[in-house]
């Protein structure tokens, strides 16, 4: 009887115990495997985003020749900074420009490549302006060539590896020449949902620069012809009151909406059609045959103002203070 009972117990253990044992082992193995995959995935993301060696060299498309050249990143940045910002600007402004250019380059490579065969091009209307050392030196006065180039190289080298991040990721670091006293949000320029770090901020000292003010005067027929090129249905009666009227302004004090005859257009479109330097303008119609646009600022107005950066540097701000003024809630990190 005891023997029978013993074998029954053994049989029960074999039938129920072993499956339970293997089931637990299988679940534990799966759990560990999942954790390892997640860790590996995170490590790969970190390497992709922050391994500086990955960006030691870039492929640069020369738009005019259509040739693609592979060059060291820092050498490329020398060409960008020297093409985009005057060497006469303050050192801290040049450093800020170097970090902005580096960030913009890496953001483009990771998120917004426009060229299949290259990382970025040398056309400022598409990517960033770039100029070779030889061409840049040739355009400077001989007496200033060495000192100017040394300032450019120092701006890039002294900020080596530094980029601007928002929540740990490289930002889309837009910049422009002169904000006219206040920068703009991306939503008011290009639409879309915008970026939280590209908000409208005030900038002092820009009125001292030649880019701050400009004027465009057109006779009425030229004005009509230019708008009709884009909008064939355009009609206007200059004898009526408010035939041209600004309807709404943006946070950055630019024209958001403007009534022009029978059309309602954005300030950005009027800027493009008429070749204005900014969408921050006022319209003056006198008794003559002319229409004058008085413009403040130069460029789209989004991100860092270059003259604003130089003005801040002259007032004692360093590159970090400049960057954090123009880009809201960002950090400067090493890649």
PLM features: what roles do these ranges have?
Residues 266-335:
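C-terminal soluble interaction/assembly domains
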């Amino acid at each position: 009887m005891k023997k029978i009972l013993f074998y029954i117990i053994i049989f029960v253990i074999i039938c129920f115990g072993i499956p339970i044992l293997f089931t637990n082992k299988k679940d534990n193995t799966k759990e560990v495997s999942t954790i390892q995959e997640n860790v590996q995935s995170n490590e790969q993301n970190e390497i992709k985003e922050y391994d500086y060696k990955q960006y030691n060299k870039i492929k640069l498309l020369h738009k005019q020749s259509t040739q693609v050249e592979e060059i060291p990143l820092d050498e490329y940045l020398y060409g960008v900074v020297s093409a985009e910002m005057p060497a006469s600007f303050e050192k801290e402004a040049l450093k800020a420009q170097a970090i902005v250019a580096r960030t913009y380059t890496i953001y483009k490579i990771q998120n917004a490549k426009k060229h299949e065969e290259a990382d970025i091009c040398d056309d400022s209307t598409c990517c960033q302006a770039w100029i070779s050392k030889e061409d840049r030196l040739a355009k400077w006065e001989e007496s200033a060539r060495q000192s100017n180039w040394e300032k450019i190289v120092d701006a890039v080298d002294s900020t080596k590896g530094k980029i601007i991040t928002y929540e740990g990721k490289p930002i889309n670091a837009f910049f422009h020449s002169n904000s006219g006293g206040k920068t703009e949000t991306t939503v008011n320029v290009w639409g879309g949902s915008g970026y939280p770090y590209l908000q409208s901020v005030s900038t002092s000292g820009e009125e001292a620069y030649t880019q701050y003010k400009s004027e465009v005067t057109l006779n009425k027929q030229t004005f009509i012809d230019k708008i009709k090129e884009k909008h064939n249905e355009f009609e206007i009666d200059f004898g009526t009151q408010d035939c041209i009227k600004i309807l709404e302004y943006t946070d950055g004090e630019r024209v958001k909406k403007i009534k022009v005859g029978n059309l309602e257009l954005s300030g950005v479109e009027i800027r493009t059609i008429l070749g204005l330097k900014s969408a921050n303008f006022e319209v003056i119609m006198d008794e003559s045959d002319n229409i004058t646009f008085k413009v403040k600022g130069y460029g789209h107005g989004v991100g860092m103002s270059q003259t604003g950066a130089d003005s801040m540097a002259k007032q004692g701000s360093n590159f970090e203070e400049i960057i954090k003024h123009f880009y809201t809630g960002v950090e400067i990190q090493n890649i």
